[in-house]
Curated annotation (Swiss-Prot):
InterPro entries: Anticodon_Met, Met-tRNA-synth_bsu_C, Met-tRNA_synth, Met-tRNA_synth_2, Methionyl/Leucyl_tRNA_Synth, MetRS_core, NA-bd_OB-fold, Rossmann-like_a/b/a_fold. It holds the Pfam family tRNA_bind. Is required not only for elongation of protein synthesis but also for the initiation of all mRNA translation through initiator tRNA(fMet) aminoacylation. A motif ('HIGH' region) lies at residues 12-22. Keywords: Aminoacyl-tRNA synthetase, ATP-binding, Cytoplasm, Ligase, Nucleotide-binding, Protein biosynthesis, RNA-binding, tRNA-binding. It comes from the Bacteria. It catalyses: tRNA(Met) + L-methionine + ATP = L-methionyl-tRNA(Met) + AMP + diphosphate. It comes from Streptococcus pyogenes serotype M1. This is Methionine--tRNA ligase. HAMAP family: Met_tRNA_synth_type2 (MF_01228). ATP binds at K311.
Amino acid sequence: MKKPFYITTPIYYPSGKLHIGSAYTTIACDVLARYKRLMGHEVFYLTGLDEHGQKIQTKAKEAGITPQTYVDNMAKDVKALWQLLDISYDTFIRTTDDYHEEVVAAVFEKLLAQDDIYLGEYSGWYSVSDEEFFTESQLKEVFRDEDGQVIGGIAPSGHEVEWVSEESYFLRLSKYDDRLVAFFKERPDFIQPDGRMNEMVKNFIEPGLEDLAVSRTTFTWGVPVPSDPKHVVYVWIDALLNYATALGYRQANHANFDKFWNGTVFHMVGKDILRFHSIYWPILLMMLDLPMPDRLIAHGWFVMKDGKMSKSKGNVVYPEMLVERFGLDPLRYYLMRSLPVGSDGTFTPEDYVGRINYELANDLGNLLNRTVAMINKYFDGTVPAYVDNGTAFDADLSQLIDAQLADYHKHMEAVDYPRALEAVWTIIARTNKYIDETAPWVLAKEDGDKAQLASVMAHLAASLRLVAHVIQPFMMETSAAIMAQLGLEPVSDLSTLALADFPANTKVVAKGTPIFPRLDMEAEIDYIKAQMGDSSAISQEKEWVPEEVALKSEKDVITFETFDAVEIRVAEVKEVSKVEGSEKLLRFRVDAGDGQDRQILSGIAKFYPNEQELVGKKLQIVANLKPRKMMKKYISQGMILSAEHGDQLTVLTVDSSVPNGSIIG
């Protein structure tokens, strides 16, 4: 029997509207929860809100309402957002919930009694927005008066700090630093991705852990300390304990805590709060003699070209706008595909619309449309029985799919969503290539091979069924739509993932509806920019007078005759590999209609880390470029055309129906 699986988001601080950064974390956890359920695990998925603190009290006062009313309103909005994003959480915890507050108070008194908490006095620079104290050396900027005395400053987050001096209770972190280091050595994979643990050790543990202030007396919106009610429990005991209280820790009904805390426990957080979860939380668990979580995943941020999202910059992206305009699945796909593990990702409207058009509409949508149409045309809508090796290309397709499915599961277990989706899109690309290889329109002719045609249709339908299964945790609506068009029930598990498992005598829909209609790139990019508040970047409609257009080009103007001397052809990628000794070059074997394949070297390796996704693509190449020697031993017999956009590069392709060697121009 598989172990129960517990996955948590951080609890969000409801001081403002949530943007796609918070949506990313919540969707990422949702994808993992759905995947684990499909793999047969019993899953508990927790999210919620951190509703106490000075900032909430201040904002409520400014709004003329009580703090409770303020957080009630925010909780309603956040729940509505998670419903819009189809988040399959099991519990939505609020730190104002009675059961949570009762456990927080009891734990505080327990730690006080065992001398892991003590009363002292704290003086330091405090950021209300960050709810954190900073030393002078930690401040990003220091303000001084005319005598050189420090009078204020800016926290690393960019928020202003103020000097605070007050009586406070402290958590004895320093008592546990050796145990924490020992734990890190025993569990080197506890913090992911690799490298984050060393960052915590070098920056915070090696300099010496300082005891942590865990109560405040300057505001009242929090859990009162029972034995000293002028103090309220400070955020990092209150907030972190939610992961245990939501399961029933120290409550009458603790069955879920017994089950899931002793199962597999994953926390996912943004890298900005890693310190609190990698240092404070494990030490708190040591004090309470509770088992450690299995994994702490700290992801990067989505940033804009001009830095972090900011309303003043007009670059904040809210998920509601993207869902209402483009649907839910494109947002879930984009966020999970575009943030590299361990790094930040850059959101651009161009990339968002481009991924919908090229990866969802072209690659996946066209494959489904063509498959359903051909099964209707050639077999009256009934999928032929699956047979192995009905054509010379079946074995290669099957082997690639098996290998990519293994990669998919490996990357899903590692919570490496971009690579998991790369594996899926490699299957999609190979299946599209399979259509071109087998040429079903030729097999369907009177003198064609109907048995081979049947095998092709069965393999296409079976491949799409597998794709619908593995994308289900990411894109539930799309998965269900593919299964419906194939005449199948929605995905309910991932246990039957073999081509041969396609049900016999299945009837596809009479006419498939495009699951991702192509978008007008310019119009939709302008729409996103307008919603972000970037009016300066929007195309303005005006009367078009061609003679008045100021033409722009990066190079000198050439004559038509000069351009006409360039021969651009369609070339299909047969093979592609990295070039040994070069980080930039890829080595292509292409069919450009010469009768024999050519070799082309192209410096695009960094833009295509999974170079195999290019196999089967029909590219545009300069065919009459004089061959040249590269890397001393390779001859390059042409140039692959590509387009640069920002810091990205995309090769230029043509429709798969265009024959190899066709002249462009």
